[in-house]
Amino acid sequence: MLRWARAWRVPRGVLGASSPRRLAVPVTFCSSRSSGQENADLRPLPLSYNLLDGDATLPAIVFLHGLFGSKTNFNSLAKAMVQRTGRRVLTVDARNHGDSPHSPDASYEAMSQDLQGLLPQLGLVPCVLVGHSMGGKTAMLLALQRPDVVERLVVVDISPVGTTPGSHIGAFIAAMKAVEIPEKVPHSQARKLADKQLSSVVKEAGIRQFLLTNLVEVGGRFSWRLNLDTLAQHLDKIMTFPQQREPYSGPTLFLLGGNSTYVQPSHHSEIRRLFPQAQIQTVPNAGHWVHSDKPQDFMDAVTSFLA
């Protein structure tokens, strides 16, 4: 039986602003990796990734994380998937996340273009795309734009229908921006200080620990590796989905959380229009983070779909 680390869950409540602390400096966010102007020819960025080896005769599995996430969210799952399927597995940091470059362009078109640059470079075309939430939208768009790149598609608890951003998402960013940490303190102490400040508004320890995975030390000062300014500015864009006319005719699985409300029955018609071969499957007792709430059920569903 595989052992899985429990991941975080986003609370439904709205976060407030946190209070500044004396004798400390604001935690900045790394901006030295900026790529230039928004929509500058949609040139792909050199994404950070981790590739696990496997059978090169089979299409690789590519995991795309959600908002505020990183490739490390799938570490355990990726290793288990290699063992179970024998395939190569790629995990990727989206632009403005993890160790990938920052850019003022947070559009799905840009994120799709990044993958169109990376996947052929690694010899992973065609591949199986598995995207959660924001990563699911990127995966859908790439499949619609470049069906030759995507052998089959798994979309986790998101749909091609735009939604209004929850106020808690903007509050996550505001809470992180408000954190202040003294210079040149040990990383363990910095995490404790940040956790304490976030705790006044982020009540669930799981979500705090998830956000704190983005806290890094640069030159003796602590920074958020997320591009918080761009993400805050483009939340509306991130919550929408680009209008598309031509469908993706490849095999597609929409894997939904039984306790999640992200994908409504009213979305199914648009799912069927754009993905006519779509299977829609629900994992009971799972929330939005299906792969962390019910990892074994998630693995079973994906591997069955690949069979």
UniProtKB/Swiss-Prot annotation:
Its main location: mitochondrion. Residues 1-34 form a transit peptide. The modification N6-succinyllysine is found at residues 79, 196. Induction: Up-regulated by rosiglitazone and down-regulated by high fat feeding. It holds the Pfam family Abhydrolase_1. It is found in: Mitochondrion; Mitochondrion matrix. One of its GO terms (cellular component) is mitochondrial matrix. InterPro entries: AB_hydrolase_1, AB_hydrolase_fold, Epox_hydrolase-like. GO terms for molecular function: lipase activity. Its EC number is 3.1.1.116. It catalyses: 1-octadecanoyl-2-(5Z,8Z,11Z,14Z-eicosatetraenoyl)-sn-glycerol + H2O = 2-(5Z,8Z,11Z,14Z-eicosatetraenoyl)-glycerol + octadecanoate + H(+); a 1,2-diacyl-sn-glycerol + H2O = a 2-acylglycerol + a fatty acid + H(+); a 1,3-diacyl-sn-glycerol + H2O = a 1-acyl-sn-glycerol + a fatty acid + H(+); 1-octadecanoyl-2-(9Z-octadecenoyl)-sn-glycerol + H2O = 2-(9Z-octadecenoyl)-glycerol + octadecanoate + H(+). The keyword Mitochondrion applies. Expressed in white adipose tissues. Interacts with OGDH and DLST; this interaction maintains the functional lipoylation of the 2-oxoglutarate dehydrogenase complex. Belongs to the AB hydrolase superfamily. Catalyzes the hydrolysis of diacylglycerol in vitro and may function as a key regulator in lipid metabolism, namely by regulating the intracellular levels of diacylglycerol. 1,2-diacyl-sn-glycerols are the preferred substrate over 1,3-diacyl-sn-glycerols. The enzyme hydrolyzes stearate in preference to palmitate from the sn-1 position of 1,2-diacyl-sn-glycerols. Maintains the functional lipoylation of the 2-oxoglutarate dehydrogenase complex (OGDHc) through its interaction with the OGDHc by preventing the formation of lipoyl adducts. This is sn-1-specific diacylglycerol lipase ABHD11. It comes from Mus musculus. The lineage of its organism: Eukaryota, Metazoa, Chordata, Craniata, Vertebrata.
